[in-house]
Amino acid sequence: MTKTTKTMNPKFYLVLALTAVLASNAYGAVVDIDGNAMFHESYYVLPVIRGRGGGLTLAGRGGQPCPYDIVQESSEVDEGIPVKFSNWRLKVAFVPESQNLNIETDVGATICIQSTYWRVGEFDHERKQYFVVAGPKPEGFGQDSLKSFFKIEKSGEDAYKFVFCPRTCDSGNPKCSDVGIFIDELGVRRLALSDKPFLVMFKKANVTEVSSKTM
C-alpha cells in the first residue's frame, strides 16, 4: 500500500507572499537618513530645515530642572539624545508609518529619576500650550496611556512629522494634531501640539553614543 503525500498548492504560497508584501506596503517602514528601514534601535531625531536648532533632548520648564519636557537643542550641531520606538500593534519588525507607537528618550540615567517616555502633558494655561513631556512607561491601552501614543507620518519626499491622535474609548475618528515647536519665554524650543509640524529625519545612533548619554 503506497502512502500519498499531500503537497501544498504553489498558489497558496504565492497568496501568502503577496499578503505579506501588501501588508508592508500598506504601512511602509519609516526609513533613516541612509534609506534603511528602522527597527527596535536608537535614532537621533534631527530637523530637516537647517539653522533652526539641533536634535531632541530633555529639559525642565520655567527654569526648574525637573520634571522633564521634550525640547530641541538650540545648536544645530548638537544631535541631542536618541530615541527608541516600541509598542505598535501591527505585526511587523520595522517601525511602521502612520501607526500609533510609543517613543522613549534613550538616556542611561537622569537626575530627575524618572522615566522618559513621550506623552502629551496637561494644558499649560500660562503658555496656552499642550507640551510633549517625559512620563512613565505606558501600561496597556488605558485612558492615561493613550496620551503616550504618537504616529510618524511622511511629510513630503524626505521628511517626517510626529502626529498625536487622542483616541478615547468613546471617540470615533479622533482629531489629530501635529507636533511642532513652541519657543518659550526663555528661548527654549519645546515640542508642543501645533498646526505647524516640526519636520524631522532620523539618524541611527551607535551603541557607544547611547550608553554614554546621561542627564
Swiss-Prot record:
Pfam families: Kunitz_legume
Extent of the signal sequence: 1-28
Protein name stated in the entry: Kunitz trypsin inhibitor 4
Induction (record text): Down-regulated after root-knot nematode infection. Accumulates locally within 72 hours after P.brassicae butterflies oviposition. Induced late in response to bacterial and fungal elicitors (e.g. Pst DC3000 and Ecc culture filtrates), and upon wounding, salicylic acid (SA) and hydrogen peroxide H(2)O(2) treatments. Induced by infestation with spider mites.
Entry's Gene Ontology cellular component terms: endoplasmic reticulum; mitochondrion; secretory vesicle
Record GO biological process: defense response to bacterium; programmed cell death; response to hydrogen peroxide; response to insect; response to molecule of bacterial origin; response to molecule of fungal origin; response to nematode; response to salicylic acid
Glycosylation sites: 206
InterPro entries the record matches: Kunitz_inhibitor_STI-like_sf (IPR011065), Prot_inh_Kunz-lg (IPR002160)
Alphabetic keyword roster: Apoptosis, Disulfide bond, Endoplasmic reticulum, Glycoprotein, Plant defense, Protease inhibitor, Serine protease inhibitor, Signal, Thiol protease inhibitor
Tissue specificity remark: Expressed in roots.
Family matches, as SUPFAM superfamilies: STI-like
Originating gene: KTI4
PROSITE patterns: SOYBEAN_KUNITZ (PS00283)
Function: Exhibits Kunitz trypsin protease inhibitor activity. Involved in modulating programmed cell death (PCD) in plant-pathogen interactions. Can inhibit both serine proteases and cysteine proteases. May be involved in the modulation of the proteases that participate in the hydrolysis of dietary proteins in the gut of spider mites.
